Swiss-Prot record:
Cellular location(s): Cytoplasm
Stored PANTHER family: UREASE ACCESSORY PROTEIN G
GO biological process, one term: urea catabolic process
Binding site for GTP: 11-18
GO CC annotations, alphabetized: cytoplasm
Presence of the UniProt keyword Ion transport in the record: no
Assembly behavior: Homodimer. UreD, UreF and UreG form a complex that acts as a GTP-hydrolysis-dependent molecular chaperone, activating the urease apoprotein by helping to assemble the nickel containing metallocenter of UreC. The UreE protein probably delivers the nickel.
Top-level lineage group: Bacteria
Protein name: Urease accessory protein UreG
Family: Belongs to the SIMIBI class G3E GTPase family. UreG subfamily.
Role, per record: Facilitates the functional incorporation of the urease nickel metallocenter. This process requires GTP hydrolysis, probably effectuated by UreG.
Record keywords: Chaperone, Cytoplasm, GTP-binding, Nickel insertion, Nucleotide-binding
Length: 204
């Protein structure tokens, strides 16, 4: 069975987790074997959306219903996600990369290091310029940080320059990028990080 790298994608509701995964998969699926696990509180809506998008065959997507605490399912008790990983591997024994999308949660949510090898945390500009200054653990500890919906900055009075400065304060040299996933702006930086950092380091 192929070694499988697992990347967790977390962030608040509506930040763009699902869209980011869909865009990445669309770019990478032709060159590698990929699966996706979605976490929703009471439904499997994200699983249905991803299946309907056609970016992956249905047998490469599994939806997990987490119940009331989505962060518990990716950290304190990740048993449902571990089971989903095993099921994806049984269905596709060549699988190289699995994305695990967390349910929408607060800035403190982080993935268990036993569940994922790397993590991406995404917020959006519409949540306010101050969000990076709050320094939540999801933003601080993630391997890659994404600030999405840059096109909304003028409408919410947010300075991207200030957000970048604040991000550098709490992340230091850890990578981050701005994106507008509607136009794919910034997507290349995320793909480059996966191809050059995740796979080189994860398979070392």
């Amino acid at each position: 069975m192929t070694d499988t790298i697992k990347i967790g994608v977390g962030g608040p509701v509506g930040a763009g987790k699902h869209e980011l995964i869909e865009k990445i998969v669309k770019r990478l699926a032709k060159d590698m074997s990929i699966g996706v696990i979605t976490n929703d509180i009471y439904t499997k809506e994200d699983e249905k959306i991803l299946v309907n998008s056609g970016v992956l065959p249905e047998d490469r997507i599994i939806g997990v219903e987490t119940g009331g605490c989505p962060h518990t399912a990716i950290r304190e008790d990740a048993s449902m996600n571990f089971a989903a990983i095993d099921e994806l591997k049984e269905r596709n024994d060549d699988i190289e990369l699995i994305f695990i999308e967390s349910g929408g949660d607060n800035l403190a949510a982080t993935f268990s290091p036993e569940l994922v090898d790397f993590s991406i945390y995404i917020i959006d500009v519409a949540q306010g310029e101050k969000i990076p200054r709050k320094g939540g653990q999801g933003m601080i500890k993630s391997d890659f940080f994404v600030i999405n919906k840059t096109d909304l900055a003028p409408y919410v009075g947010a300075s991207l320059e200030r957000m970048a400065e604040d991000t550098k304060v709490f992340r230091g040299n850890r990578p981050f990028t701005f994106t507008n996933l509607k136009t794919d702006e910034g997507l290349d930086e995320v793909i480059e990080w996966i191809e050059q950092y995740v796979f080189l380091k994860g398979l070392a």
